[in-house]
Amino acid sequence: MRASQYFIPTLKEAPAEAEVPSHIYLIRAGFIRQLAAGLYEYLPLGFRVLKKIEGIIRKYMDDAGALEVLLPILAPAELWQETGRWDVYGKELFRVEDRKGRFFALGPTHEETITDLVRKNIRSYKDLPKNFYQIQTKFRDEARPRYGLIRGREFIMKDAYSFDISEEMAVKSYEIMKEAYKKIFDELGLDYLMVEADVGAIGGKYSHEFVVKVPNGEAHIVFCDNCGYAANVEAAKYEFELDKLPPEDEKPLEKVHTPGVSSVEDVSRFLDINQKKIVKTLVYILDDGTAVAVLIRGDRELNETKLINYFKALDCHLASSEELKDLGIVEGFVGPMGLDIPVYADISVKDLHNFVVGANEEDYHYINVNIPRDFKPVDFVDFSTAREGDPCPVCKKPLNETTGLEVGHIFLLGTKYSEALKAYFVDKDGREKPIVMGCYGIGVSRLMAAAVEQSHDENGIIWPENIAPFKLHILALNIKDDQIKTVAEDIYTKAKEKGIEVLFDDRDISPGAKFKDADLIGIPYRIVVGRGVKNGKVEIQTRKDGKKEEIDINEIDNFLDRL
């Protein structure tokens, strides 16, 4: 492809709204343009990258036995109401009304639609298993679209759905897809982690995320270098047995005056006691209005995702000052004793002795509190946020933390959707049973951004070879020089004949502008045709490591054959 005939609108400066490297460089290098907040146009270079990513995904989906389909973007509200997700998704779900007053969802996912297709067309165990996938535009009404392709209101996804006759068979389908995902991300050339994850609004029994490691990513991951355990912080566990304090003999309960002292740090200083022996009592309001108290050790943070999952809630929030007042609870001095709401405790509190809690009276705390002598929680639950240094739940070695971008997510759904939508099959004994499902997503457009976040420098993008828009970039530094033009044209012709995807910069612009654009665009290999042709030389450059090498023109064939 000749640059003079292509469309590469590069920019010297990034737009003011571009904050992260992928947003900055994809716009500056002419891969995308913004139409509105969270909406992007894919220009020729960007579209080529998308097609490369989609091609790799299709290859391994097909190899895994998945069948490609294309489902409508719009889904009737009735389908989403059958599963209850019309309300669960809340404001993030785009809802549209047609001229007849009928409501539809602009699909962020397609569980309802694909399950409806299956329930209408598959009735016998002989028709199972099946696995369908599509690459389709999705929609999510983000409150604050940001970071370019990372968090948009419109995005491209590959979503797949497996249908099996039993959980045992569904697990096999899940494992097949998990292995296919590993192959996809390996071939994409990305540094990623497969991590245990929360099932979220999709629901299901368990799930894994595929996270590309990047600084300041939205996904927070804890992982173990020793055994390979990795989990999203929302789902991560730690070995709490190794985080206990030594046992103590119980001391008499005592109420102490703590004027104006309410935070863990202040109580620790005032009473001269380790923060691990101070227990926070947090009052939460669940989405149905239920108030619950949750105890957690003073040095640990509560994981609201675990809380929501335990109570099977849609959402929760910390009680406000007004809500605490309505409950008759004294803000700043909340404790478990004497509360009129259910009290639950994190596992960090289970074997704690002689600890401190609020006395539910202004300016007072209890010390030397012990369970079950002084109160008894309804249940002990893992509500803690795992963090760096915690013992690994598998091998007990210290955990590490990193950040990244979620680019893939797989779920073993079980029968959540098939039961809600009455997608049943008849087994070999003539009994009707719900189909067991799995679902598997990959953010195609987000992968483009993730690759740039992980692979760039101060000059621009450094594309992994398998998804680069072109493999070779030929720069003719002075296209008006007949010798330079002749050599560059000859190399361009040879590269095309060898089946190499090549971009030939034949524009009549300065060498400096060509080099800047080449660095911005980030094509893996570069042949620079300049003044060296007078000595029978051209320069070979590698974008990834910046390595430069001058070779004889008659060695070009050998170089091209190695690409």
Swiss-Prot record:
GO molecular function, one term: aminoacyl-tRNA deacylase activity
Domain notes: Consists of three domains: the N-terminal catalytic domain, the editing domain and the C-terminal anticodon-binding domain.
Keywords noted in UniProt: Aminoacyl-tRNA synthetase, ATP-binding, Cytoplasm, Ligase, Nucleotide-binding, Protein biosynthesis
Protein name, as recorded: Proline--tRNA ligase
Pfam families to which the protein is assigned, alphabetical: HGTP_anticodon, tRNA-synt_2b, tRNA_edit
Catalytic function, reaction form: tRNA(Pro) + L-proline + ATP = L-prolyl-tRNA(Pro) + AMP + diphosphate
Self-association and partners: Homodimer.
Keyword Hydrolase carried by entry: no
Family note: Belongs to the class-II aminoacyl-tRNA synthetase family. ProS type 1 subfamily.
EC number: 6.1.1.15
Keyword flag ATP-binding: yes
Organism of this sequence: Persephonella marina (strain DSM 14350 / EX-H1)
Annotated function: Catalyzes the attachment of proline to tRNA(Pro) in a two-step reaction: proline is first activated by ATP to form Pro-AMP and then transferred to the acceptor end of tRNA(Pro). As ProRS can inadvertently accommodate and process non-cognate amino acids such as alanine and cysteine, to avoid such errors it has two additional distinct editing activities against alanine. One activity is designated as 'pretransfer' editing and involves the tRNA(Pro)-independent hydrolysis of activated Ala-AMP.
Coiled coil region boundaries: none
Protein's cellular compartments: Cytoplasm
Gene it is expressed from: proS
Enzyme class of the recorded protein, top EC level: ligase
GO cellular component: cytosol
InterPro entries from the UniProt entry: aa-tRNA-synt_IIb (IPR002314), aa-tRNA-synth_II (IPR006195), aa-tRNA-synth_II/BPL/LPL (IPR045864), Anticodon-bd (IPR004154), Anticodon-bd_dom_sf (IPR036621), Pro-tRNA-ligase_IIa (IPR002316), Pro-tRNA-synth_IIa_bac-type (IPR004500), Pro-tRNA-Synthase_IIa_type1 (IPR023717)
GO biological process entries: prolyl-tRNA aminoacylation
Transmembrane segments: none
